[in-house]
């Protein structure tokens, strides 16, 4: 039985019929699309779904914007900088529309769940044809049909977040690695974060739907999957019964053909012993954990509403490493959160020193309208934020270099992903700990697992020599 928040078969049938109608209209024509994606892996996967629908409708992908008949921007709202970039880009595209009045321009994603952004587009960007959000991607064929036939701006942003969609066509960016959504939305409401407002509350996919998708990927030759969610550790809580994220990993580990399983992102407050033991015991689950800490000060963590302490986070790290000694741990850190003093920042630096992360995504706090942190007192000056970010990056780069140097001379297993973009004579591959290794090899090895000896190391990329092909 479907959960109540699944999109109905009748609605999906309607969209499929519209796709067929547009494909019929496009028969015998050379029509093209281009998608620009901003933000997280969830957005990347949403863009794969949009691309899949466009190709079902007869469009072909192009990098040449002058050639495009449909141009989509899939947007991110996590930081103000991303919004500024998108709106600047949309302004630039007006000239393209002037040269090609038949071009359909669409904007989707998290930014479109912000009312003030939608109003700005309505008032200042009349050259944009379609506006839709994160909850009704499945309606894109209908919105495109309206835009093609009415030539008036189509805005369809819904507040209803209870929409999980199965069965949409997907044009994946790789034929080797695949993103697989397992849970949408977030219930955590960190005070700085806009995601619960743009992506909605947590909604888990049914395990049978996830298993069916991964089995299909295995049959098509995919070797690696990355399970996606704002908080994968919450998977299954809304489904009832005896399913959780650790149990899902056990189910997926049994699927033949899949060689590697990754996942992101995990919330520290929801890391369980059961999950740690699953990561330890399941041979396909890679030794890499992305565990955002955000700050090293208990005062700041409380203001962020992260619902764990510095001490609890360090306990998790100790337990993970005790069970999985060779694991790579990465994180997210925000500097300059409202109320952060120099002492608070020193506590963050101290935590980074103690944990010795393999890598970190570091950011200056960005005020997001509508979040509690935006109206907090003691906002930190931008120059102070920049100074702290530089110091944090310098420390983390030093640690990342030292961690990578420990691998020099060792033989590691890699999945060979393709030809190096910098050197056509080399292949690019990835270790189980998610580090990139380049080495000389033939293109026929792409898609294979191999052992490579590390000969040179940098912070997150390495050079190596092929030792043996495994399978």
Swiss-Prot record:
PROSITE patterns: MTTASE_N, MTTASE_RADICAL, RADICAL_SAM, TRAM. It is found in: Cytoplasm. Residues 172-402 form the Radical SAM core domain. GO terms for molecular function: 4 iron, 4 sulfur cluster binding; metal ion binding; N6-isopentenyladenosine methylthiotransferase activity. Signal peptide: none annotated. It is an enzyme of class 2 (transferase). Its main location: cytoplasm. It comes from the Bacteria. Keywords: 4Fe-4S, Cytoplasm, Iron, Iron-sulfur, Metal-binding, S-adenosyl-L-methionine, Transferase, tRNA processing. Its cofactor is [4Fe-4S] cluster. [4Fe-4S] cluster 2 binds at residues 186, 190, 193. Residues 405-468 form the TRAM domain. The keyword Thylakoid does not apply. Its EC number is 2.8.4.3. Binds 2 [4Fe-4S] clusters. One cluster is coordinated with 3 cysteines and an exchangeable S-adenosyl-L-methionine. GO terms for cellular component: cytosol. InterPro entries: Elp3/MiaA/NifB-like_rSAM, Methylthiotransferase, Methylthiotransferase_CS, Methylthiotransferase_N, Methylthiotransferase_N_sf, MiaB_methiolase, rSAM, rSAM_horseshoe. [4Fe-4S] cluster 1 binds at residues 40, 76, 110. Residues 31-149 form the MTTase N-terminal domain. Gene3D superfamilies: Methylthiotransferase, N-terminal domain, tm_1862 like domain. Catalyzes the methylthiolation of N6-(dimethylallyl)adenosine (i(6)A), leading to the formation of 2-methylthio-N6-(dimethylallyl)adenosine (ms(2)i(6)A) at position 37 in tRNAs that read codons beginning with uridine. Belongs to the methylthiotransferase family. MiaB subfamily. Monomer. This is tRNA-2-methylthio-N(6)-dimethylallyladenosine synthase. It comes from Caldanaerobacter subterraneus subsp. tengcongensis (strain DSM 15242 / JCM 11007 / NBRC 100824 / MB4).
């Amino acid at each position: 039985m479907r959960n109540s928040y699944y999109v109905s078969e009748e609605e999906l049938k309607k969209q499929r019929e519209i796709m067929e109608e547009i494909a019929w209209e496009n028969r015998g024509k050379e029509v093209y699309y281009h998608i620009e994606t901003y933000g997280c892996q969830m957005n990347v996967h949403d863009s794969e779904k949009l691309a899949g629908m466009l190709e079902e409708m007869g469009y072909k992908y192009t990098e040449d914007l002058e050639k495009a008949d449909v141009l989509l921007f899939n947007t991110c709202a996590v930081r103000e900088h991303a919004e500024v970039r998108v709106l600047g880009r949309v302004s630039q595209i007006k000239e393209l529309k002037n040269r090609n009045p038949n071009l359909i321009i669409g904007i989707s994603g998290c930014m479109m769940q912000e009312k003030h952004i939608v109003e700005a587009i309505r008032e200042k960007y009349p050259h944009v044809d379609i506006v839709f959000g994160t909850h009704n991607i499945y309606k894109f064929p209908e919105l495109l049909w309206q835009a093609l036939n009415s030539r008036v701006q189509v805005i369809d942003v819904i507040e209803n977040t209870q929409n999980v969609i199965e069965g949409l066509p997907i044009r994946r960016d790789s034929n080797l690695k695949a993103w697989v959504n397992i849970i949408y939305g977030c219930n955590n409401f960190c005070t700085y974060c806009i995601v619960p407002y743009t992506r909605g509350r947590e909604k888990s996919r049914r395990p049978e739907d996830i298993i069916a998708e991964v089995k299909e990927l295995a049959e098509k030759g995919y070797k690696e999957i990355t399970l996606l969610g704002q908080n994968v550790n919450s998977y299954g809580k809304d489904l009832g019964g005896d399913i959780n994220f650790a149990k899902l990993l056990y189910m997926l580990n049994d699927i033949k053909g899949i060689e590697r399983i990754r996942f992101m992102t995990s919330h520290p407050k929801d890391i369980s012993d059961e999950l740690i033991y699953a990561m330890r015991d399941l041979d396909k689950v890679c030794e890499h954990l992305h565990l955002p800490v955000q700050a090293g000060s208990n005062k700041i963590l409380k203001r962020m509403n992260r619902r764990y302490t510095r001490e609890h986070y360090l306990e998790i790290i100790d337990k993970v490493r005790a069970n999985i000694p060779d694991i790579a741990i990465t994180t997210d850190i925000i500097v300059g959160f409202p109320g952060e003093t120099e002492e608070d920042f020193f506590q963050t630096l101290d935590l980074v020193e103690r944990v010795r992360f393999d890598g970190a995504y570091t950011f200056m706090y960005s005020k997001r309208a509508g979040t509690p942190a935006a109206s907090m007192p003691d906002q930190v000056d931008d120059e102070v934020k920049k100074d702290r970010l530089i110091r944090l990056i310098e420390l983390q780069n030093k640690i990342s270099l030292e961690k990578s140097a420990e691998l020099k001379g060792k033989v590691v297993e890699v999945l060979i992903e393709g030809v190096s973009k910098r050197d056509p004579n080399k292949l690019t591959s990835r270790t189980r700990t998610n580090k990139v290794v380049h080495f000389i090899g033939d293109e026929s090895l792409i898609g294979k697992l191999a052992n490579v000896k590390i000969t040179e190391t940098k912070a997150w990329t390495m050079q190596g020599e092929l030792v043996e092909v495994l399978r």
